[in-house]
Swiss-Prot record:
Keyword Hydrolase recorded: yes
Designated name of the protein: ATP-dependent RNA helicase DBP2
Helicase C-terminal domain: residues covered: 347-494
Organism: Saccharomyces cerevisiae (strain YJM789) (Baker's yeast)
Ranges where the record places region Disordered: 1-56, 493-546
Residues modified to Phosphoserine: 88, 90
Cited Pfam families: DEAD (PF00270), Helicase_C (PF00271)
Lineage per the UniProt record: Eukaryota, Fungi, Dikarya, Ascomycota, Saccharomycotina
Gene name linked to the record: DBP2
Length: 546
């Protein structure tokens, strides 16, 4: 989604006038960009344009030589609200304690507690209030003053905590303070994300809140043809949201450059490193002027992310909401059933029957492989359930369609792999079902975090088999921390009680009358389709070959 030329400009002198002309008489600044010769002496940044369509290896500029040639830019826009200024240190400490907020660094601005205290110009504030938000989230209360002050920062918060707006809104203010884009300029704000789904989600927020400023944005990701993305980049966009691999492709063929980037965001940095993007991230960041503002966001704080921050952030300040210890939201009810593989389908049906009692239910089912995703989806659809699958072998158009069907509730059951589900933010997911357990406890917490978001409650069901015994102790620890009921069958895998006996799998759950009555999975649900007739014949929705 792109917009026309931006006609609002911000400067420091009229910041508190709210809603005035934000151009601020910066014509000389704009001309300094328009009159500047295009091109330069390094590829991907100011690089030369020979062999424009042929990939050219990105070369790190000599910033000691290049930086003095670049125009200066504004990045500190924060004006502390008088209500914030008048709060005592003890009040601030109490607020941070109540919000489980930990800070580090020096000269950290005080947190705000309302949208008005954030000091956003009217064109931003009006967009926020139009969305009907009651108050800022914890990470926004501290993150906005940090980001608006122009400091490099690290934000550590769980998915669904409001972190996207924590960097998106200050980014919009940052853009409106800079000279307008000239033909051939790249973005002012660059957001790197691990997956196309998260990138599209970020673009939606940027479009929504940048609309009044006519700020254009482009989303650049793999899995689709480059042609449309190239056209969008050529028209000029103040914000580019990108996955690392596709952005490097665009830089190497000269379809964009990073010479105007002064606000860099690394979103879900831990996931990007988990997915092996560190070399690409480093290659990209090396192309950006070192006096930029950099914001790094992560759900966890492992040593690899710490090292990346140490290498690329300058004297950063840090805010963390919640514990650094891996934990699950206490809004989620965790149910673990110790089963054998052949019991999983019957258990799945049981929980879907429970979930479907809610007319607006959404259930996300995780499987370990693409093939298993398709197998589960095929089985469920044959059994009358409105299920669709999403995984890496499906093209982007089909993935987008599946996500849309899931979001609007026409297909309230989605089966996904971990990779396909990363970055997906769908409101109203009531149930997460781990048909196959993930390979590590971090992915378990990430999976079940798809429900119970933004203060809502949710339920996570996991089918634990003997093959998952390596996860047992850590899973029990996560459940204990969240005060969950731990089934006796699972305690076999607890280091604190290892070696103890355990009841037979599934004993005492009952209610199914035994597996024999099903007459085999193919025909045991003969009357089920009649119960789904209200769905308009889900088997004939025109996507029967999905």
């Amino acid at each position: 989604m792109t917009y026309g030329g931006r006609d609002q400009q911000y400067n420091k002198t009229n910041y508190n006038s709210r809603g005035g002309d934000f151009r601020g008489g910066r014509n000389s600044d704009r001309n300094s960009y328009n009159d500047r010769p295009q091109g330069g002496n390094y590829r991907g940044g100011f690089g030369g344009r020979s062999n424009y369509n042929q990939p050219q290896e990105l070369i790190k500029p000599n910033w000691d030589e290049e930086l003095p040639k670049l125009p200066t830019f504004e990045k500190n826009f924060y004006v502390e609200h008088e209500s914030v200024r008048d709060r005592s240190d003890s009040e601030i400490a109490q607020f941070r304690k109540e919000n489980e907020m930990t800070i580090s660094g020096h000269d950290i601005p005080k947190p705000i507690t309302t949208f008005d205290e954030a000091g956003f110009p009217d064109y931003v504030l009006n967009e926020v209030k139009a969305e009907g938000f009651d108050k800022p989230t914890g990470i926004q209360c501290q993150g906005w003053p940090m980001a608006l002050s122009g400091r490099d920062m690290v934000g550590i918060a769980a998915t669904g905590s409001g972190k996207t707006l924590s960097y998106c809104l200050p980014g919009i203010v940052h853009i409106n303070a800079q000279p307008l884009l000239a033909p051939g300029d790249g973005p002012i704000v660059l957001v790197l994300a691990p997956t196309r789904e998260l990138a599209v989600q970020i673009q939606t927020e940027c479009s929504k809140f940048g609309h009044s400023s006519r700020i254009r944005n482009t989303c650049v990701y793999g899995g689709v043809p480059k042609s449309q993305q190239i056209r969008d980049l050529s028209r000029g966009s103040e914000i580019v949201i990108a996955t690392p691999g596709r952005l490097i492709d665009m830089l190497e063929i000269g379809k964009t450059n990073l010479k105007r980037v002064t606000y860099l965001v690394l979103d879900e940095a831990d996931r990007m490193l988990d997915m092996g993007f560190e070399p690409q991230i480093r290659k990209i960041v090396d192309q950006i002027r070192p006096d930029r503002q950099t914001l790094m966001w992560s759900a966890t704080w492992p040593k690899e992310v710490k090292q990346l921050a140490a290498d690329y952030l300058n004297d950063p300040i840090q805010v963390q909401v919640g514990s650094l210890e891996l934990s699950a939201s206490h809004n989620i009810t965790q149910i673990v059933e110790v089963v054998s593989d052949f019991e999983k389908r019957d258990r799945l049906n049981k929980y879907l029957e429970t979930a479907s009692q809610d007319n607006e239910y959404k259930t996300l089912i995780f499987a370990s492989t693409k093939r298993m995703c398709d197998d589960i989806t095929k089985y469920l659809r044959e059994d009358g359930w409105p299920a669709l699958a999403i995984h890496g072998d499906k093209d982007q158009r089909e993935r987008d369609w599946v996500l849309q069907e899931f979001r609007n509730g026409r297909s309230p059951i989605m089966v996904a792999t971990d990779v396909a589900a990363r970055g997906i933010d769908v409101k109203g997911i009531n149930y997460v079902i781990n048909y196959d357990m993930p390979g590590n406890i971090e992915d378990y917490v990430h999976r079940i975090g798809r429900t119970g978001r933004a203060g809502a409650t949710g339920t996570a069901i996991s089918f634990f088999t003997e093959q998952n015994k390596g996860l047992g102790a850590k899973l029990i620890s996560i459940m204990r921390e969240a005060n969950q009921n731990i089934p006796p069958e699972l305690l076999k895998y607890d280091r604190r009680s290892y070696g103890g006996g355990h009841p037979r799998y599934g004993g005492g759950r009952g209610g199914r009358g035994g597996y024999g009555r099903r007459g085999g999975y193919g025909g045991g649900r003969g009357g089920y389709g009649g119960n789904r007739q209200r769905d308009g014949g889900w088997g004939n929705r025109g996507r029967s070959n999905y």
